[in-house]
Amino acid sequence: MNSTPPETSTHYNNVNEENFVTDAPATHHHHHPHAVVVHHPNPWGLYLGRCLYAIADHIPYFIMYRFFPSLDEERFNALLSLSNQYNVPYKKEEAAHVQLLGSLWEAHHRLFFHQDKIPFVAAQHAVHVDWKEMGFQASDPSTDFRGGGLLSLQQLCYLATHYPTAWTKMAGGDFLLAAAGINISMRLITLLGLNTRKNVLNAQLPPTYTRVTARVQLGTCLTDPPLESENENSKDAVALRRLNEVYCVYLELLFREWQKSDKNILTFNTLLMETYEEAERLLCLAPSVEQFRVLALEQ
């Protein structure tokens, strides 16, 4: 799917991970043969694109399904490989899982209390009231991970360590950061067709033209060949980092809408659904993860 017509272009060799929420991404004005070219959106083109996908979604399924795009087998298998590694249940008895939980604890406390390290001791901190400050629904965060699994914990850690400014803005207030993040992790995995766990989202994602196109576009972005600037050890690691970047943009979109709203927890699910619909339309218009960030956050 082509992006909307450009007004200006920015060349990205990598994502500047400190610029989320408050600052514009760093730009590189020299041309790099392996850089991602990011076009700043034409507002009218973006508006028209949204309208066209909204109209397509109202055409009956028995007509539109003939026009649905599909993800080729090689790319889907690459997504399955990613899912097999990271989309697994969180287990309290697994040392590596508990260690990751500890990383989230330490990152949060380092940001909020400005200390180099707040050591995580599983016996003391695996169940602790401080988890509720991060937006978990109970003092035992493992209960929240039943739906999103280990991936949802990994993505919360990614946000806290790569976008500390975003974390400090979202955590500790009236925004249920952890609960929202876990929901977004579940949504992305379900959108990609990789959700093997039974949860309420499975019944809420009927195929629409926008949703199917977003799935194919996201799957393509995640499995495109790595750039020279992406020095992760494997294609799975590259795909995971890209998925984490999309996750962070989803969270920023949701937080932005929450800030505009009356902040009524009773309408939070409605806000979630509206954010998902907007994000999926933008995914349809974005040829890369970097372009998705620009479309979503520079409007």
Language-model region placement:
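Extended acidic/polar regulatory tracts at the flanks of large eukaryotic scaffold/adaptor proteins
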Residues: 2-299
